[in-house]
Swiss-Prot record:
A Pfam entry, by short name: Rieske
Record-given protein name: 3-phenylpropionate/cinnamic acid dioxygenase ferredoxin subunit
Domain of life: Bacteria
Organism field: Shigella flexneri serotype 5b (strain 8401)
Cofactor note (record): Binds 1 [2Fe-2S] cluster per subunit.
HAMAP family listed in its UniProt record: HcaC
Domain Rieske, first and last residues per copy: 4-99
Named cofactor requirement(s): [2Fe-2S] cluster
Role this protein plays: Part of the multicomponent 3-phenylpropionate dioxygenase, that converts 3-phenylpropionic acid (PP) and cinnamic acid (CI) into 3-phenylpropionate-dihydrodiol (PP-dihydrodiol) and cinnamic acid-dihydrodiol (CI-dihydrodiol), respectively. This protein seems to be a 2Fe-2S ferredoxin.
Assembly behavior: This dioxygenase system consists of four proteins: the two subunits of the hydroxylase component (HcaE and HcaF), a ferredoxin (HcaC) and a ferredoxin reductase (HcaD).
One GO process term, biological-process aspect: 3-phenylpropionate catabolic process
Length: 106
C-alpha cells in the first residue's frame, strides 16, 4: 500500500465530503466522526461522489442518477448502479488524515 496525506481533520467537518485530487481521485467522507474514502467516480455515470448526498447510515447517493453506495464496503445498494466503488483504508494520526492506496501497477 502507498499511504498518502489527504488533509487536516478540520477540512472535513462531520456530515461533509472532500474531493482529494490524487490518482485515483478520492471522495473522503466524515460520518459521525468516522472517515471513509471511496473512488470519487460513480460506477454508473461520470459523477463526482464527493458532490453526492451523504446519509447518516454511511451511505452516499450519486448526485446524477440517485444510485446509492455503502461507504464501508463500496457496494452498490440500488439501481441504476450495479458495480461497487473501490474503498480505501483511512487513518487519522494526530490532526491529519491519511489514505492507503494500492501500489501503482507497472
Amino acid at each position: 500500500m502507498n499511504r498518502i496525506y489527504a488533509c487536516p481533520v478540520a477540512d472535513v467537518p462531520e456530515g461533509e465530503a472532500l474531493r482529494i485530487d490524487t490518482s485515483p481521485v478520492i471522495a473522503l467522507f466524515n460520518v459521525g466522526g468516522e472517515f471513509y474514502a471511496i473512488n470519487d467516480r460513480c460506477s454508473h455515470g461520470n459523477a463526482s461522489m464527493s458532490e453526492g448526498y451523504l446519509e447518516d447510515d454511511a451511505t452516499v447517493e450519486c448526485p446524477l442518477h440517485a444510485a446509492s453506495f455503502c461507504l464501508k464496503t463500496g457496494k452498490a445498494l440500488c439501481l441504476p448502479a450495479t458495480d461497487p466503488l473501490s474503498t480505501y483504508p483511512v487513518h487519522v494520526e494526530g490532526g491529519d488524515i491519511f489514505i492507503d492506496l494500492p501500489e501503482a501497477q507497472p
